[in-house]
Amino acid sequence: MISDSMTVEEIRLHLGLALKEKDFVVDKTGVKTIEIIGASFVADEPFIFGALNDEYIQRELEWYKSKSLFVKDIPGETPKIWQQVASSKGEINSNYGWAIWSEDNYAQYDMCLAELGQNPDSRRGIMIYTRPSMQFDYNKDGMSDFMCTNTVQYLIRDKKINAVVNMRSNDVVFGFRNDYAWQKYVLDKLVSDLNAGDSTRQYKAGSIIWNVGSLHVYSRHFYLVDHWWNTGETHIVKKDYNGEWK
C-alpha cells in the first residue's frame, strides 16, 4: 500500500496558510520564503504553482541526456540561474543525467535496472544522485551548486513501479515542475526498459512520492500563492495580479 501522504492540492493549502500567517523564513541571501520542513506528498500533478514551460523542460531533458557538466551545453540560451551557480569554468554538479547514467557516478540507472530485473521485490532499487564529497564540491572554483536530489528509490508492487524521490531542497515554482518532469521521464523509461527485458512483466508506472527537507516558495512568487488562495487558480501573469504581493 502507498502511505496516506498529502496531495499537491494539500501542499498548496499548507503554503497558502503559511503566507496568510506571514510565517516567513529568511534564507542565506536575505530573501523571505515560506517553507514546509519535511514535506511528503504524492506528486499527483505536474506543478504546484505557476505553469509548465514545456520548451524549457525539453531543453533541460536534452542537456541531461548529454551528461554534460557544462551549462554552455544546455540547448538554446543558457538560463541565468545556471550561469549564476556555475563555476568560473561554467561547470556545475547537478546534471541529473550525468548523476544516473555516467560511469563516473557508478552507473546508477543501470545498477537499479539490473537489481529490479533480478529481484522485483527488492528494496535496493535505488539511484543515488549526490555523494559525500558534495560537502566540498558544491563551491569548487566559485560554484554554488549543492545537488538538491539525494536519492530516488523504485519499488515494484502489484505490477506497478513506484518512485520515492528524496530531496534536501526544492523550490516550489521553478524547481518542482522541472524536477517532476525529469522524474516522470526516468520512471517511464525504467518501466519500458524492464518490460523490454521480459515481455511477461507488463509493469506500469505507479505513484511518485515526493519527500523534501525544505519545500519552499521565494518571495518573488508569493503572488502566485496569494492568487491561488483567493481564486483557486494556480497561475496568473504577474502584471495581471493586483494583490498584496505585487
Curated annotation (Swiss-Prot):
It is an enzyme of class 2 (transferase). The keyword Aminoacyl-tRNA synthetase does not apply. Its EC number is 2.1.2.8. The gene is 42. It catalyses: dCMP + (6R)-5,10-methylene-5,6,7,8-tetrahydrofolate + H2O = 5-hydroxymethyl-dCMP + (6S)-5,6,7,8-tetrahydrofolate. GO terms for molecular function: deoxycytidylate 5-hydroxymethyltransferase activity. Keywords: Transferase. SUPFAM superfamilies: Thymidylate synthase/dCMP hydroxymethylase. The active site is at 148. Belongs to the thymidylate synthase family. It comes from the Viruses. This is Deoxycytidylate 5-hydroxymethyltransferase.
